[in-house]
């Protein structure tokens, strides 16, 4: 996302935001042969052949999809707080969603089921046993509780992703989560998603 600033009053500025689909890549005068291009990328000690990560959404990230994406050189990301750990019949749960597109009540009902740590561990282990890199997403509000569980289950990369991720997450009645300190306490690489400012990225 790119931004530009506009004055909206005395001493006030607003940032205009552009989505990626609103942008176009302008080619340069010189092109380069695909044989000379290397698409591999690295996160810590992990190497991937293609620069693609999946969004950790239940509608997309089934165990089979995650495994196949890893085999093709990308990185599939598991949503630890989604349906994987809530419904043993995952295909049946997804079929209910597909049968009623746009009906949010079904999604809310399915996500209201309690999270089964043993089931989530079993499904993460299924991906780990396939030989692909295991990446798991948790939300900022549940990171402190969920991160140790998914790492123990086999997560090799941890994503902390929400609609908006800040340097410190505060909730009434709970202990504030300082992301810099929290990330430093973990033994796996961490990627923050939903970061809207490069200065926040530098903090981590």
PLM features per residue range, with description:
Residues 1-202:
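Active-site entrance/lid segments in N-terminal catalytic domains of soluble metabolic enzymes
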